Amino acid sequence: LGTGFGAGVVIDSRLLTGDNGCGGDVWIMRNKKYPEMIAEESVSIRAVRRVYQELTGKDASSLTPKDIYDIAEGTAEGDQQAAVRSFNELGEMAGDAIIRALNIVDGLVVIGGGVAGAAKYILPGIMNEMNRQIGTFAGASFPCLQMEVFNLSEKEAFDKFLEEKDKMVKIPFSEREVHYACHKKIGIAVSTLGASRAV
């Protein structure tokens, strides 16, 4: 999360590049709030600035995400509630794209990039989005992910994530047993390395 919205998909310790080098291209996914726009328009530095400006009605073109973060923290002048909501909306829009990726690639999510420093304001939006329900025309309701989502930045959630609830199940008419994941789960973590060291 930074100037733009990017992702790297790692499967069995190998970076997914895809047949055309487009593996992990989340930036071009559909934007939840503006379906005619790309996701990156709501998940980027410019998105934080735009949303803050929309919420306050004041020109924010000279503000950086760090400025808006400081406003959210209450250490700089400005609309604190609008600043928090600006990062929260980025989280919601990122969460929508992450859901789509996770329904194909089932694995841990690590958030990084320049804007990830505001994770405490972004993660609630991501978590709320990833825990929402979707439905059918018949009226049935399903979680948008088959897995329970854990914010690994929170100790209690981290400890629960580590709990093993899997078991071995006997195959009918056989002596063989197979591993059964009783508890489907996904963890969301925030990188502490920074983009330069991570790459």
Residue ranges and their predicted role:
Residues 1-46, 162:
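Glycine-rich phosphate-binding loop of actin/hexokinase-like ATP-binding domains
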Residues 31-199:
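ATP-binding/phosphotransfer module of carbohydrate and carboxylate kinases, centering on a glycine-rich
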